[in-house]
C-alpha cells in the first residue's frame, strides 16, 4: 500500500499518521498538513480500494483488516512508533491499531468518532445507500456535502462544492468497494474493548455534526481510560475542513500535550 511521507522537520521527529473517513482520500487532511509538517513527520494515504491504492475489496472486509494493512505499510516504511489522527471511520481504524499494536501507537486522536454506530448515523447511511442504489455515484456524491458541512458554509461556497463534486465523481471508489467499507464501519463495535486502549487519547467533536451526534464522543470519552474531550461549537462533520483554524489549534495543542504526557509516564 502506497503511503505519502513528509520529510521529518528534525531528527527523530514524532510521526503522525492521518486516517480519513469513508471517502478514504488522504487529501481530506490538506487543511492540516502545513501546520503539522512543521512539528511532525506526517503520513497520509489513500485507503485500500480508493485513490492511488486501487483494489477490489472482499465482501467481509473489516476495520481489523484496515488497521492491519496500514500497520504493515508503516513497518515496511521503517516506522515503528506513531501517533494516529482518525476522522470517523479513521477513528475506528485508530482504535483498532491501538488495541492490536499498543507498543506502536503513542497517541490517538478521534475526530467525530464513536464506539459503535449510533441509530441516527445508521439512518443517515440508509438514506445515502438508497440514493446510491437509485441514482448511482452522482447521487451519492451530490448528497455527501449535506452530511459533512454546515448549511451557511456550503451556501457561501457553491462554486467550490461544484468543483469538489466533479473531482469526487471522477475518483469515485466504486459502488462495491464503498458498500464493503461502509459495512465494515457499521459492523465495528468497540463498546466492550475501548477500556483496553491505554495510550492517551484526544477526542474532538463538533456540536453541530449532522451525521454523528456529539453524544457519541461523550460515550467515547467515558469509555476510554486516558482521554480528554474537546468540543467545537461549529464546523459540522468535516470540522477540520470548515474551521481549520480552531481545529488545528486544538489538534496541535492536544498532540503536544499528550505526547509529553506519554513520555513523562515512561
Curated annotation (Swiss-Prot):
<dbReference type="Pfam" id="PF00561">
    <property type="entry name" value="Abhydrolase_1"/>
</dbReference>
<comment type="function">
    <text>Involved in pyrimidine catabolism. May facilitate the hydrolysis of carbamate, a reaction that can also occur spontaneously.</text>
</comment>
<dbReference type="GO" id="GO:0016811">
    <property type="term" value="F:hydrolase activity, acting on carbon-nitrogen (but not peptide) bonds, in linear amides"/>
</dbReference>
<dbReference type="InterPro" id="IPR050266">
    <property type="entry name" value="AB_hydrolase_sf"/>
</dbReference>
<dbReference type="GO" id="GO:0019740">
    <property type="term" value="P:nitrogen utilization"/>
</dbReference>
<dbReference type="InterPro" id="IPR029058">
    <property type="entry name" value="AB_hydrolase_fold"/>
</dbReference>
<keyword id="KW-0378">Hydrolase</keyword>
<dbReference type="InterPro" id="IPR000073">
    <property type="entry name" value="AB_hydrolase_1"/>
</dbReference>
<protein>
    <recommendedName>
        <fullName>Putative carbamate hydrolase RutD</fullName>
        <ecNumber>3.5.1.-</ecNumber>
    </recommendedName>
</protein>
<comment type="similarity">
    <text>Belongs to the AB hydrolase superfamily. Hydrolase RutD family.</text>
</comment>
<dbReference type="GO" id="GO:0006212">
    <property type="term" value="P:uracil catabolic process"/>
</dbReference>
<dbReference type="InterPro" id="IPR019913">
    <property type="entry name" value="Pyrimidine_utilisation_RutD"/>
</dbReference>
Amino acid at each position: 500500500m502506497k503511503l505519502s511521507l513528509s520529510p521529518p522537520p528534525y531528527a527523530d521527529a514524532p510521526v503522525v499518521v492521518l486516517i480519513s473517513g469513508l471517502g478514504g482520500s488522504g487529501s481530506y487532511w490538506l487543511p492540516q498538513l502545513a501546520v503539522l509538517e512543521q512539528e511532525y513527520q506526517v503520513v497520509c494515504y489513500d485507503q485500500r480500494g480508493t485513490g492511488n491504492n486501487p483494489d477490489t475489496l472482499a465482501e467481509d472486509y473489516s476495520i481489523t483488516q484496515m488497521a492491519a494493512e496500514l500497520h504493515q505499510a508503516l513497518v515496511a516504511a521503517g516506522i515503528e512508533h506513531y501517533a494516529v489522527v482518525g476522522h470517523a471511520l479513521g477513528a475506528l481504524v485508530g482504535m483498532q491499531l491501538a488495541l492490536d499494536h499498543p507498543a506502536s501507537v503513542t497517541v490517538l486522536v478521534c475526530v467525530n468518532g464513536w464506539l459503535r454506530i449510533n441509530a441516527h448515523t445508521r439512518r443517515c447511511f440508509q438514506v445515502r445507500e438508497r440514493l446510491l442504489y437509485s441514482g448511482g455515484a452522482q447521487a451519492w456524491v451530490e448528497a455527501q456535502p449535506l452530511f459533512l458541512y454546515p448549511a451557511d458554509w456550503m451556501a457561501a461556497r457553491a462554486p467550490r462544492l461544484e468543483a469538489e463534486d466533479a473531482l469526487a465523481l471522477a475518483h469515485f471508489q466504486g459502488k462495491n468497494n464503498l458498500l464493503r467499507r461502509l459495512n465494515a464501519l457499521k459492523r465495528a463495535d468497540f463498546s466492550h474493548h475501548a477500556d483496553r486502549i491505554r495510550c492517551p487519547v484526544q477526542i474532538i467533536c463538533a456540536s453541530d455534526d449532522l451525521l454523528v451526534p456529539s453524544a457519541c464522543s461523550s460515550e467515547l470519552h467515558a469509555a476510554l481510560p486516558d482521554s480528554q474531550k474537546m468540543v467545537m461549537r461549529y464546523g459540522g462533520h468535516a470540522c477540520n475542513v470548515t474551521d481549520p483554524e480552531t481545529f488545528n489549534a486544538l489538534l496541535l495543542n492536544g498532540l503536544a500535550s499528550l505526547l509529553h504526557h506519554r513520555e513523562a509516564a515512561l
